Regions:
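Active-site microenvironment for binding and transforming phosphate-containing groups
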Residues: 1-264
Length: 264
């Protein structure tokens, strides 16, 4: 299990050796945006030049072997809705996504699916044997609302088996930087039915540092995934803010990166 950095023509992305499908966790490198959005910004609602975002998006779609209007994407609301998508859900770039969903599942070949992040946990899942994939935006609210449980349920409805699912979680804000009040660890405790050993660092000032990726790895194991089939990036988006977009570091003045996967 490992993440490797790939550079294709200047576009830098991360890939998990565990995921048996074409996929990418993008970084800030390899786009055309300028100023505070330099350079690979995929957020279309942050104030960046729309034509720059469009070109950035085209480059990421090309990584997935697709055209700019050939992917299905999330419209994220920090909820637990997971949508099963088909070719009818292909998104016309820069248009409004007509549904709300923080996770996407498909069994259609040649249909890339994509979610967007800037500190939240990006999760890509794949059952290669049964040809089912998922892309999930796991912010803390989506996580504790059990979006991964919804994802695995939708994948299994398409024929996937938990023991065959491989999952990778890309760069996200780490326990080193994810400072929270009591509401977050309390919600995580409930989410995981108390299986939270090693997930929190409680500080003297009353704040708690939370390892959200590790928490979601616990949930995936509870859902039947094998521990050896779960990969976790060691990178923190806030610590590595020059490489990744971080909402907390920039206080909201930032772009977005993507996690994308496709069945070839």
């Amino acid at each position: 299990m490992a993440f490797e950095e790939i550079n294709e023509g200047g576009l830098v992305f991360m890939r998990s050796t565990l995921i048996p499908a074409r996929h990418a966790f993008t970084t800030r490198y390899g786009g055309v945006s300028r100023g505070e959005f330099e350079s690979l910004n995929l957020g279309s609602n942050r104030g960046d030049d729309p034509e720059a975002v469009r070109e950035n998006y085209r480059r990421v779609c090309a990584l997935m072997g697709a055209g700019i209007d050939d992917c299905a994407v999330t419209r994220q609301v920090h909820g637990n809705t997971v949508r099963v998508v088909t070719g009818a859900d292909r998104h016309v770039c820069m248009s409004t996504v007509p549904y709300e969903a923080d996770g996407l599942v498909t069994n259609e070949r040649g249909l890339p699916i994509m979610c967007f992040i800037a500190d939240c946990v990006p999760a890509l899942l794949c059952d290669r044997e049964h040809s089912v994939i998922a892309a999930v935006h796991c912010g803390w609210r989506s996580s504790v609302a059990d979006i991964l449980g919804e994802t695995v349920k939708k994948m299994c409805a398409l024929g996937a088996k938990p023991e065959n699912i491989h999952a990778a979680m890309g760069a996200a804000i780490g326990r080193c930087c994810f400072e929270t009040d009591d509401d977050v660890p309390e919600a995580v405790e409930k989410y995981l039915s108390g299986e939270t050993a090693g997930l929190f660092d409680r500080r003297a000032d009353g704040k708690t540092m939370v390892d959200l990726r590790a928490a979601n790895a616990v949930r995936l194991r509870q859902l039947g995934l094998k521990a050896e089939n779960i990969d976790i990036s060691p990178e923190c988006t806030m610590c590595s803010h020059e490489k990744y977009w971080s909402h907390r570091y920039t206080k909201g003045r930032r772009g977005s990166q993507a996690a994308a996967i496709v069945l070839d």
